[in-house]
């Protein structure tokens, strides 16, 4: 895994040896897919746009690489059963969402920027400046972002009492 992260963050290249996060929302919410079918979300870490990866050329090839790996490991038969798919690249994050270099998750996931070391939800310099989102405590991803909002909500409630 360390070699994979080194390729992404230090060498800024795509790797054939990928890791991914796989989520199946239809397992807990049947409305996420037509009856008898499933919905999956796959998150694959890739380098940001400082890498100069040409996503117009590489996007479909990389998607096929991801499907091949899932087909050989956790979801045999996935390739021939996909009804509809799409993917987002760092280009989308940079152009449509105006994130720096197409970064989808804020700061680099390393120990010195994790857990307590992430940006705190209240500025240590300006007393009325607050932060919420993927780059703040407690962390990235949708659960982290929602938890960050909850932390801030609790902080405001605590300040109102005291």
Task: Show the residue positions of the predicted features.
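A glycine-rich dinucleotide-binding beta-alpha-beta segment and adjacent secondary-structure elements
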Residues: 15-21, 76-138
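Conserved FAD/dinucleotide-binding core of flavoprotein oxidoreductases
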Residues: 34-68
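A conserved FAD-binding loop/helix module that cradles the flavin
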Residues: 114, 134-157
